[in-house]
A protein has these predicted regions:
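Extracytosolic ligand-binding ectodomains
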Residues: 1-101
């Protein structure tokens, strides 16, 4: 979260900081950076797809403890874990343990 807070303080208004879409975009950009780093000097479409389908235990800021992104050539869906939560009137409170497929 510290990485997000530093980025948001530098580049976003106070309103944008609270926008979950901005946070999602930030995490998506971090995921793309990870894929491009895995590509090395080979930035061909084939290699970008190969690396995007070879993500292992990548953790984005703000994810629940234990949640990570994993992809494979047979499973394109990066998020295969969820945490049920309940709104207590102001905040989302996690319920139970992290669920995985």
């Amino acid at each position: 979260m510290k990485q997000w807070e530093t980025f948001a303080a530098k580049y976003l208004s106070a309103t944008d900081f609270k926008d979950s879409s901005a946070f999602y975009g930030f995490n998506t950009a971090l995921l793309m950076i990870r894929v491009l780093k895995q590509c090395g000097d080979d930035l061909s479409r084939d290699n970008i797809m190969r690396q995007a389908l070879n993500l292992k235990d990548f953790v984005v800021p703000g994810s629940f403890p234990g949640a990570s992104i994993n992809t494979s050539p047979t499973n394109y869906f990066p998020h295969r874990q969820l945490h049920l939560a309940r709104l207590d009137g102001e905040h989302w409170e996690p319920l139970g343990e992290l669920l995985s497929d």
